[in-house]
Structures are given as structure tokens and as C-alpha cells.
């Protein structure tokens, strides 16, 4: 279930309000282009600037519009355990298939604090939980040992690994086995991540290149030479897009790309701002190189 290409959905805005029409359009664009899973209200969805009502609404819309065609992995993380429980409980009631829960940011818990945070959510909720380990944003790195302890709990099923450290894939596989789901949060390392035992990605690029990302993920997990060569070919096409998505703060570049494709406006909420003209040129060039524009 939790494998292949899963999109870290952007949240479209119009005049600083949620653009429901554009959001529904984005969801169906993903459904029709082979995306396995939809991930609303994550980092790329600008969750830090969504109100609680908006956070719940984007999850509700995602579940409703996907209508069982795609899995929904709802972003429900917070640096407040109480709030994370509340958001996860809502996602469960809404019908989400799983929750993506980021390691608590800013308050810098110990490894025991991380364990107790996820255990408390696990004990109060009944849907699968995917740990989101992103030390670059959370300023805390969950250790493999802590992850292994959490995997013993009933609802913890895997990790979105955004450490950028490919050795972690091997370490986590050795410690937890192949039943522990490993999804990369770094588009640029997806090929090697899967080669080492990962099973997919939660992708920024998939917002604008869903079919390419889906085809790449499928090819990368088929054990024959022809498929491996196809995965390498698709990865080479995707790499310029991956690079262009992170020249400036995510999700500003991907929102500009989505605007070029007519999917939604490029509006972001402060403190994020729209991309500069030099970045626009690079994003546009990357889309053209992949025949997306």
C-alpha cells in the first residue's frame, strides 16, 4: 500500500485563502497520472501557515475527491503532542489511510522524548503512522534505535526519510527488516534509495510531473535489466526538475512550475515569497527539458 510515487501536495491559495477549485483540480491531475498516494498538509502543503480549519479541510477534500482511487497519507504532525493527536484523530475520522507525522520541531526533544511523543499518538489513534524524519527542518534526528523501538508499537509502519543519508536505508532495513516501509523525502536520491531497499517516495516533483515520477518508481522496483535501465533513463530526465525545485524555499519553485502548467497560482503565504526571476528561468528550462512545457 505505502509504496511507489506519493505526492507531497501543494496547497493552492487565491487572495490568501484556500483555492478549493484549484486543489480539487490538482488532486484529479494526480489521480489521472498514476500517482499512488496523496499527502496533504505536509511541508510542501505549507502546513505551518494553515489554520486548524484549513488543515482539516484539505485532508477532508483529499479523502473525498480521491474516493478510494488513491491512498491518502495525511500530514498531522506538530511539535505539540496534544495537537498532533488531535490532527491525527481528525484524519482517521475523515477516512485517511495513514498519518505522516514529522518529528517535533523547535523544542528539540531527546530520543526518549521522541519515543514518548509517537507512543502517545499511537496509543490514541488507530491508523498507520509514518514517521517523518527531517533533521534539516526539525533540528532533531531520530536514531535508528528509537525508530526500532517505535516499530514495535501497533500503528508505526515506516518512515519518510529526509536525512539525505543513504546509509540510513541499509541501517533501518538491517534493524527493522523489510516490513518497515521506507520512503524517501529527497527526490534526487530516489534511485539509489530504492536500490538499497526503499519502496518509494513522498515527492515534491510529482506535483508537476506525476506520470514521470510514477513510471520511474515502478521501473526502479522491477528486477530486470530493461526496467533498471528505464529507471536510470527517467531519473536523468527528472534530475534537472528535482534540482530546480529547491533553488529557493520549497514550495515556492514547485508552485511556480504548477502555474506554468496551468494547475494553480504561484501564491504562497508569508513568510514564504514567490521565486525570483532567475529561478523562474531555471524552473522553466527544467520543465522544457522534460517535455512538460
UniProtKB/Swiss-Prot annotation:
A Gene Ontology cellular-component term = cytosol
In terms of domain of life, where is this protein from?
A: Bacteria
- Residues flagged as site, Part of a proton relay during catalysis: 43, 106
Top class in the EC scheme: lyase
Gene3D superfamilies given in the database record: Aldolase class I
- Please list the residues that make up the active site: 132 (proton donor/acceptor), 160 (schiff-base intermediate with substrate)
Keywords, A to Z, come to: Amino-acid biosynthesis, Cytoplasm, Diaminopimelate biosynthesis, Lyase, Lysine biosynthesis, Schiff base
Quote the catalytic activity from the record: L-aspartate 4-semialdehyde + pyruvate = (2S,4S)-4-hydroxy-2,3,4,5-tetrahydrodipicolinate + H2O + H(+)
Cellular location(s): Cytoplasm
Molecular function terms, GO-annotated: 4-hydroxy-tetrahydrodipicolinate synthase activity
User: Which residues are listed for pyruvate binding in this entry?
Assistant: 44, 202
Gene Ontology BP term (one): lysine biosynthetic process via diaminopimelate
Q: Which InterPro entries match?
A: Aldolase_TIM (IPR013785), DapA (IPR005263), DapA-like (IPR002220), Schiff_base-form_aldolases_AS (IPR020625), Schiff_base-form_aldolases_CS (IPR020624)
Pathway recorded for this protein: Amino-acid biosynthesis; L-lysine biosynthesis via DAP pathway; (S)-tetrahydrodipicolinate from L-aspartate: step 3/4
EC numbers for this chain: 4.3.3.7
What is this protein's function per UniProt?
Answer: Catalyzes the condensation of (S)-aspartate-beta-semialdehyde [(S)-ASA] and pyruvate to 4-hydroxy-tetrahydrodipicolinate (HTPA).
Q: How is the quaternary structure described?
A: Homotetramer; dimer of dimers.
Report the sequence similarity comment from the record: Belongs to the DapA family.
Q: Per its UniProt record, what HAMAP family does this chain match?
A: DapA (MF_00418)
Which protein is depicted?
A: 4-hydroxy-tetrahydrodipicolinate synthase
Q: Which organism is it from?
A: Pelagibacter ubique (strain HTCC1062)
Instruction: Give the lineage.
Output: Bacteria, Pseudomonadati, Pseudomonadota, Alphaproteobacteria, Candidatus Pelagibacterales
